[in-house]
From Swiss-Prot:
Keyword rRNA-binding: yes
Keywords recorded for this protein, A-Z: Ribonucleoprotein, Ribosomal protein, RNA-binding, rRNA-binding, tRNA-binding
GO molecular function: rRNA binding; structural constituent of ribosome; tRNA binding
SUPFAM superfamilies for this protein: RL5-like
A Gene Ontology biological process term: translation
Protein known as: Large ribosomal subunit protein uL5
Family (UniProt): Belongs to the universal ribosomal protein uL5 family.
Protein's UniProt keywords contain Ribonucleoprotein: yes
Amino acid sequence: MNRLKQLYENSIKPAIVKEFDIKNSMLIPKLDKIVISVGVGESSKDEKILQNMADTISLIAGQKAVITNAKKSIAGFKVREGFPVGIKVTLRKDNMFVFLDKLVSIALPRVKDFRGLSRDGFDGRGNYNFGLDEQLMFPEVEYDKILKTHGMNITIVTTANSDKEAFKLLELFGVPFAKGK
């Protein structure tokens, strides 16, 4: 069993039940999924860079990434229907816990001048969004094999009913939030 999954079962669940006085065990907040997405921008024109980006995200996530295509044409953005516009991967169950463990204990501490994640990333429904400026902080990524550095958006979806519950859940998982507020 994964380290964070054990932590959730043994100490996080009881702490959340105690703090929020939850009577029904089905209402205890838990992680649902983690979505990693990248907008490809100008890189969509170069198939080699696009494939390299998809391979990098697959390495980071430990699961095959999917290239997403535009659903309709938008002249203002010079995008036509069917053009690649992004790359995403959705992690659930064990892969989700493995990625979160790697993110919290390895990747985020490697970020230069890291002061913690912003507390403003909650959406009001118990989900948390944040962005990373580059992919080089992950141990699987080799600098020599990267054709173009890119950032990524990470969405952590929880079953929490409020941002307060979601914040406490993520804090107990060890997600480093910035001090203040």
